Amino acid sequence: MTELRAELRDLYDDYASALDEMDLDAWCGFFTDDCTYKVISFENYSEGLPLALIECRGIGMVRDRVAAIRETAVYEPRQLRHLVSGVRVDGVEGGVIAARANFLIAESLSDREPQIAMVGRYLDRLARVGTALKFRERLCVYDNYRIRTSLVVPV
């Protein structure tokens, strides 16, 4: 389990680095073809309500999200830093790994002091594809009461 946890830690660090560098093509590569990616509030998640800020079902929707960011979205330039801690393996069953970690995203807009943009936890189900671990399901459950600016870059 220690080796798996170390492998997960590396995966989470690589994921955060890809987003911090705005390498959205690399971000797509972290998911299985049949993935689910959601950004959902703690309130909606804990009450079992389906409404999410972002929901992608399948790699096609993940790629569409990237295309929208690149081609149609208009947003203020920003720098983000994704900090991940508390990586835990919750279990392994049938080749699917259940894992979790905490995240904090700091955001620096061009003319403002940095601030915490979002804090929460990742609830993940991962599968091995070849030698790589990939997200079959990534739930980004944020604790914020509200989103201060805009949610452009994936969580």
Feature map (PLM): residue ranges:
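Short, low-complexity N-terminal intrinsically disordered segments enriched in polar/charged residues
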Residues: M1-D33, I40
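Hydrophobic pocket/interface hotspot
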Residues: Y15, W27, V62, A99, ...
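Short helix-to-loop capping/linker segments positioned immediately adjacent to catalytic or ligand/cofactor-binding
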Residues: Y15-S17, R70-P77, S110-D111
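A solvent-exposed, acidic/Ser-Thr-rich amphipathic alpha-helical stretch
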Residues: D33-N102
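A beta-strand edge to alpha-helix "cap/lid" segment located at domain peripheries
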Residues: Q79-L83, R88-V155
